[in-house]
């Protein structure tokens, strides 16, 4: 039974390390772009636009008006 709990506890650790790895990889790719203020502003606006689009799409798909 203790082996079961050991296996169950591995999955959250895997999820955390996987998510952190994706974030760090993405941040290192974006870091040179953020050196110029104009690029940073465009990046933030683009990210916000994508989040708003996904939010509106999911609300429409799930009928959450």
Curated annotation (Swiss-Prot):
Domain of life: Eukaryota
Pfam families: DUF751 (PF05421)
Keywords per UniProt: Cyanelle, Plastid
A GO term from the CC aspect: cyanelle
Subcellular location: Plastid, Cyanelle
UniProt main location, coarse: plastid
Family that this chain belongs to: Belongs to the ycf33 family.
Name this protein carries in UniProt: Uncharacterized protein ycf33
Species: Cyanophora paradoxa
Gene that this sequence comes from: ycf33
